[in-house]
Amino acid sequence: MTLDISKYPTLALAETPDELRLLPKETLPTLCDELRTYLLNSVSQSSGHLASGLGTVELTVALHYVYNTPFDQLIWDVGHQAYPHKILTGRREQMPTIRQKGGLHPFPWREESEYDTLSVGHSSTSISAALGMAICAEKEGQNRKVVSVIGDGAITAGMAFEAMNHAGDVHSDMLVILNDNEMSISENVGALNNHLARVLSGNLYTSIREGGKKVLSGVPPIKELVRRTEEHLKGMVVPGTLFEELGFNYIGPIDGHDVVELVKTLKNMRELKGPQFLHIMTKKGKGYEPAEKDPIGYHGVPKFDPAHNSLPKSSGGKPSFSNIFGDFLCDMAAQDPKLMAITPAMREGSGMVRFSKEYPEQYFDVAIAEQHAVTLATGMAIGGYNPIVAIYSTFLQRGYDQLIHDVAIMNLPVMFAIDRAGLVGADGQTHQGAFDLSYMRCIPNMVIMAPSDENECRQMLYTGHKHQGPSAVRYPRGNGMGTPIESEFTALEIGKGRLVRQGEKVAILSFGTFLANALEAAEALNATVADMRFVKPLDEALLRQLANEHDVLITIEENAIAGGAGAGVIEFMMQEKIMKPVLNLGLPDKFIHQGTQEELHEELGLDAKGIEQAIRHYLAK
């Protein structure tokens, strides 16, 4: 449903940044109010990321007002906060389609708009990319400006500091804006800091500063005195020492919701040379009281009525796989005081809220630091404890070297609880868990499990926790199948699958939660179905039996076909000289766009109907 733009008269005048820059500066506060209301009304009808965007309205307006986008390059880290950017860059009328199949991408996306300089989704990439662009802009000599906007969560990642360290060394012209919405980090926001920011970014101060450096460069004691005096002035009111040490000129913190002050400061900073760092303070969920009070709950929202001041409650029903994992942690920790659970900033998403409250001494949130999370688990395993790393499939990619070098080579008992495996839906290409089976299957010592339902997931988590070596249990986003969950723990025999349905001629080997679809297709085909359970090691005895008793084998998995479980089946059969045709069903060799999980399964032929059709087509060849 498209919103009536006539209710937002100032916003109606700013469909693009070129139009925005024609507005008088005194109209910008009104524009921000209308943009914030428009964003709230739009996302409440479409679902999507809300609280982050509400907090960056003034910053977005100020950036596009001051900088000549898209010639000047603006990079949003992660991209949750970029909805106002999309609204102001010609995509206002398409906002109702965001995160939907065929609609606007959930994050800034290069293919979608010339204003989206960098395709994003994972955190902490913006400063590295911005530095690369700044180096090229400097070589081209076109006076192109480059700006990176990064949040206080994303900046904690090592990659961000690696980039800032390098930027301070090469000294290219670029601006990093820290969007800080954690008031505990810096509370001194107000008139003094706004005034100081203007002073520190103004022409008089910068000319004295740069001139003083040149004039006094041959007199080290005096130069040091000037520097220390400047740092003393700034240190009284700003927490910028770290960024200065990395080679940035630090300015702030300033009020990120005062659009006029932002414009003044950005205009000053636009002309500065070398790496600049602007620290702004914002409130996540700004302007909508329920989101201000619960920014985590309103980070990503379903459709809701803003007038009700609350989000719709889930209808209960089948538990999510994330909750299955969270319950397992609590039940297991009651038996095992040496269980240690680690998450890289995904407490809520991974179902660990209850565990973090009931077992705080056994819970470790390492922030956005996947590499550290994995090697922290290594140290805990060496120390005689039983670590579990709870991580999304797409984010484990960031800790791949540590998985090999720090866990698998030493054959340490670290279990990886891999959430969001397979297609996650609305977050699109950057978040689909399409590759974990492929990138783990080639690692020696790994035991890899793929449950078909929620009870199997619980028992596999127990199996992995008890296994004296590296293991992984991968499970999808969303709810289970309604299978009864056994409270008692039962360790599964490593590398053993199970026969679920006996048929003839065709055998379907299911890895993971496509088992229900496979069974439905098998009814129409009178096919045999096996729940393989283990991707590594494969149940070789069951494989031989199925190959001997059937004409065709079909493998199905919610992972890339290339290098996945089905590829492992073919490798084994070729090694054993078992010459039977094999059809691999799974995710194709492309990055898969957004849509609901159901829509994507149907499109890719991985629902029951699609599986049946694919098998019939293969048999007809």
Curated annotation (Swiss-Prot):
SMART domains tied to this protein: Transket_pyr
PROSITE patterns associated with the record: TRANSKETOLASE_1, TRANSKETOLASE_2
Alphabetical UniProt keywords: Isoprene biosynthesis, Magnesium, Metal-binding, Thiamine biosynthesis, Thiamine pyrophosphate, Transferase
Recorded GO MF terms: 1-deoxy-D-xylulose-5-phosphate synthase activity; magnesium ion binding; thiamine pyrophosphate binding
Residues binding Mg(2+), per UniProt: 152, 181
Residues binding thiamine diphosphate, per UniProt: 80, 121-123, 153-154, 181, 288, 370
Reactions catalysed according to its record: D-glyceraldehyde 3-phosphate + pyruvate + H(+) = 1-deoxy-D-xylulose 5-phosphate + CO2
Subunit structure: Homodimer.
Official protein name in the record: 1-deoxy-D-xylulose-5-phosphate synthase
